[in-house]
């Protein structure tokens, strides 16, 4: 049965090869000062930095820069950005990069004018944001997180060894996002396949809940098949525009709240990976890939019918002459085979985790779960199976 819901998403998407030309028009809605936030030098290498700075200058904008945003953005970088916002009375934060850069931009937008410690108030206590929020826009260069069209912001507090996520209300969503698949061509393959599994994990976290024939489940199955098919093409030819554009749009649809409408959701794989990332700083998608198979093997019997459906509808497993348990297991074997086919990581050891870290990760993970509510002991068992 579908839950009651209201659907609203305020982000305006400009998609395609010429989408950057729309930035000039978007800038007219905001004041003079723009905080340009990005990672390292990749946007400079592909010429995107120069294009954006030119558009900003032609629009009469005063540009303040914050560079060096890393994968798994840190609270210290958020504080650095907030200081720039206050000192320069920033009117718009323009994030150019992948999900980490956009997450950091959103974090700066809500915390710049926060009284007290924003991480404690907003990422631990989940207090409502009652201070000024600085608008955010984005130019996407790496796909996976869906941050370009949602209110999510995952931030790592280095001092606390805590990586927490928060989904903020629509006021924090990017006002606009520019998506040109060509900007993803230069992303290294390791990061590309990491992003691909991040997309799949977002979809599976929303899929593995309940056993009804929810319309949203059909949407998720279609998106999963699209990602799988196009990933195989993109891995062989990273410059295949059709494959990269389908992956990019699937990533956005996977986490713009549409794929979770009217459903219970899980997200425990992400909760475990967040703490893995806090201790190892590993690539998010690779951490998800390493955790997913042991996690699903641990809980699939509690949601057997949905795992059977997953096997049949996503992986085309034939049910003929097989028990439900056999079908479900075959679907998980197919998922694991795809993970290996794409060159994704399957061991926590390969991500820099030590045996001594596992209890620390388990005991600091936010407890939850969809089909089975987990304890810290359950999570430790899963982590040991991943190691």
Task: Place the predicted regions along the sequence by residue.
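Active-site segments that bind and position negatively charged phosphate/pyrophosphate groups
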Residues: 206-329, 333
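Short Gly/Thr/Asp-enriched flexible loops that form oxyanion-binding sites at enzyme active sites
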Residues: 80-82, 101-115, 149-152
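C-terminal charged capping/lid subdomain of soluble metabolic enzymes
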Residues: 171, 314, 318-387
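Acidic, glycine-rich active-site loops and adjacent beta-strand->loop/helix elements
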Residues: 69-73, 100, 111-112, 141-144, ...
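ATP/NTP phosphate-donor binding region
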Residues: 1-92, 348
């Amino acid at each position: 049965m579908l839950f009651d819901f209201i659907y609203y998403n305020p982000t305006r998407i400009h998609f395609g090869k010429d989408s950057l030309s729309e930035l000039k028009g978007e800038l007219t809605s905001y004041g003079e000062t723009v905080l340009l936030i990005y990672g390292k030098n990749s946007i400079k290498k592909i010429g995107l930095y120069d294009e954006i700075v030119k558009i900003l200058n032609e629009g009469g904008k005063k540009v303040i820069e914050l560079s060096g945003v890393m994968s798994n953005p840190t609270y210290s970088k958020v504080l650095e950005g907030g200081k720039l916002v206050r000192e320069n009375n920033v009117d718009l934060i323009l994030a150019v990069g992948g999900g980490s850069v956009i997450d950091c931009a959103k974090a700066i937008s809500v915390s710049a004018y926060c009284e007290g410690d924003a991480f404690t108030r907003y990422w631990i206590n989940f207090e409502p944001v009652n201070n000024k929020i600085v608008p955010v826009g984005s130019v996407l260069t790496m796909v996976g997180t869906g941050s370009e069209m949602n209110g999510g912001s995952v931030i790592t507090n280095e001092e606390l060894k805590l990586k927490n996520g928060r989904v903020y209300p629509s006021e924090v969503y990017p006002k606009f996002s520019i998506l040109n698949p060509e900007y993803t061509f230069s992303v290294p393959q390791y990061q590309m396949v990491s992003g691909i599994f991040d997309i799949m994990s977002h979809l599976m976290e929303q899929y593995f809940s309940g056993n009804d024939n929810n319309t949203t489940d059909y949407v998720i199955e279609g998106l999963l098949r699209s990602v799988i098919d196009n990933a195989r093409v993109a891995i062989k030819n990273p410059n295949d525009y059709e494959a990269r554009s389908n992956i990019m749009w699937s990533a956005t649809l996977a986490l713009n709240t549409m794929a979770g409408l009217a459903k219970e959701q899980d997200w425990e794989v992400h909760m475990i990976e967040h703490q893995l990332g806090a201790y190892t700083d590993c690539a998010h998608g690779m951490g998800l890939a390493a955790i997913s198979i042991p996690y699903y093997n641990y809980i699939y019997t509690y949601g057997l019918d949905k795992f059977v459906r997953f096997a049949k509808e996503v992986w085309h497993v034939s049910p003929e002459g097989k028990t439900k348990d056999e079908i479900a297991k075959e679907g998980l074997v197919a998922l694991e085979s795809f993970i290996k086919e794409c060159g994704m990581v399957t061991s926590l050891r390969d991500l820099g985790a030590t045996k001594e870290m596992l209890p620390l990760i388990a005991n600091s993970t936010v407890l939850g779960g969809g089909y089975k509510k987990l304890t810290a002991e359950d999570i430790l068992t899963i982590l040991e199976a991943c190691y």
